[in-house]
Amino acid sequence: MSIKDITIVIASFKSEKKISQCLKSIHSDYNVINVENSDDQIYKKKIENEFKNVRCILAGKNLGYGKANNIGLKEVKTKYALILNPDAELNPKALGNFLTLAQKTPDFALIGPNVDENKKKTNLHFEESENFLLLKANIVKGYAMFLN
């Protein structure tokens, strides 16, 4: 498996400042689909010009987080998708660690990250733990979810 096996989907709504930091935390070799819940052509041009690996889809209006993610997921052509919030930042090793976990458990449905919320930002990283094979959870934080 390689980085070409993952597409990152980010639903946003007028989040230009936040999403810029998020996109800077993603290596430029990863494909990213940003579904912007507006019709802001200036936003689309700015994001796609600054981040060549990002395809911005304008929803035309605020369809909400779930519907915007579904639009993005329909465009994914890779084996895996990562739904990521526009205010999250990835640890540099996060996606590589995810691929390692995915290889060990190829029939997973969803993998969520370990989260470091001690700072003023949320730092996401994926590591194997004793709870990795957890089959049921009471809550999954939705700011980063890997889907198979």
Region roles according to the model:
Residues 93-125:
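Conserved donor NDP-sugar-binding/catalytic core segment of glycosyltransferases
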Residues 81:
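Short aromatic/hydrophobic "clamp" motif used to bind/position activated sugar donors
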Residues 30-39, 57-59:
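Short beta-strand/loop segment that forms part of the nucleotide-sugar
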Residues 85-89:
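The conserved acidic donor/metal-binding loop of glycosyltransferases
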Residues 131-147:
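A recurrent flexible, glycine/aromatic-enriched loop bordering the glycosyltransferase active site
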Residues 59-76:
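Glycine-rich, basic loop-to-helix element that forms the pyrophosphate-binding segment
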Residues 10-28:
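Short, well-formed alpha-helical segments that are part of the catalytic scaffolds
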Residues 25, 36-44:
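A conserved acidic beta->alpha catalytic loop
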